[in-house]
């Protein structure tokens, strides 16, 4: 099988070029900063609908529901949520 060129630049030429890094350094920095702010501001919790760490258990329900028997788990969880 003969190896023919596809006419594309080799990957090593691309990543060692100055032009590549001039374009990608700001882009990578902006992506990192925006991802950090997305999580840090709590917007990720709002977008994905997950509770914030301080909202998992309210002041009325400070104990985790405990399941003792494997086959009665649904019944035990229903009782634990009914007591709220």
From Swiss-Prot:
Gene3D superfamilies: Photosystem II cytochrome b559, alpha subunit (1.20.5.860). Heme binds at residue 24. Its cofactor is heme b. It is a single-pass membrane protein. This b-type cytochrome is tightly associated with the reaction center of photosystem II (PSII). PSII is a light-driven water:plastoquinone oxidoreductase that uses light energy to abstract electrons from H(2)O, generating O(2) and a proton gradient subsequently used for ATP formation. It consists of a core antenna complex that captures photons, and an electron transfer chain that converts photonic excitation into a charge separation. Heterodimer of an alpha subunit and a beta subunit. PSII is composed of 1 copy each of membrane proteins PsbA, PsbB, PsbC, PsbD, PsbE, PsbF, PsbH, PsbI, PsbJ, PsbK, PsbL, PsbM, PsbT, PsbX, Psb30/Ycf12, peripheral proteins PsbO, CyanoQ (PsbQ), PsbU, PsbV and a large number of cofactors. It forms dimeric complexes. Belongs to the PsbE/PsbF family. This is Cytochrome b559 subunit alpha. It comes from Gloeobacter violaceus (strain ATCC 29082 / PCC 7421).
């Amino acid at each position: 099988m003969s190896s023919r060129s596809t006419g594309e630049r080799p990957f090593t030429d691309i990543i060692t070029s100055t032009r590549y890094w001039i374009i990608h350094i700001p882009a990578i920095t902006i992506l990192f900063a925006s991802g950090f702010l997305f999580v840090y501001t709590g917007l990720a919790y709002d977008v994905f609908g997950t509770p914030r760490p301080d909202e998992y258990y309210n002041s009325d329900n400070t104990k985790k529901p405990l399941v003792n028997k494997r086959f009665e788990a649904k019944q035990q969880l229903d009782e634990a949520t009914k007591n709220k």
